[in-house]
Amino acid sequence: MEKRVLIWDDGLNYVNYMEVLRAVDLTPVVGREAAGLCAALLLPGGGDIADRLPEDEIRTIRAYAAAEKPILGICRGMQALNVFFGGTLYARVPGHQVKAGDILHDTRAVGELAELVGTAPRVNSNHHQAICRLGRGLGVRQWAADGVIEGICHSRLPVLGVQWHPERQAFALRRGEAADGAAVFWWLRRQAEKNSGG
């Protein structure tokens, strides 16, 4: 049965996300809502988050969380999850953003993320906002050497967030010097298979 994943549409280019979802046999649906809930929700990278998330994004995350459907947050998406669960963000952290391309840096991972990418993955990042105070129910699973949070999981829900960009480091885009981003999307596939909707 087809498993659809809603990619939250923030008006950006989602080609890499769509390609990697198809590579793990998931069907991407780009929009701010779908007819009924999909099997999973993907919150992609994007622009800055102000003090509050847009109401339609809050409603969408709330619907997927209430239905215990898997949610994957990438870069801005991880930050959005943290804000949704009551956390806060630093407006600007140095050393994690460049004008073009990504910064590669070493991290430490534990728990679910260590199972996916190992305990000392090198990851690709490009961001200037970062988690300050962690949201309710969230646990840190990955850190950069400077202490910036690079990965989170929810204690009860199938929610995973990464500050880095696995879609730029998976399948045809994979570079040998960084963690295999495909593992994150295989996680989403496994979670979607456990899900009856989509």
Functional labels for PLM-detected ranges:
Residues 1-72, 76, 83-90, 94-120, ...:
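N-terminal beta1-alpha1 cap of cysteine-dependent amidohydrolase-like domains
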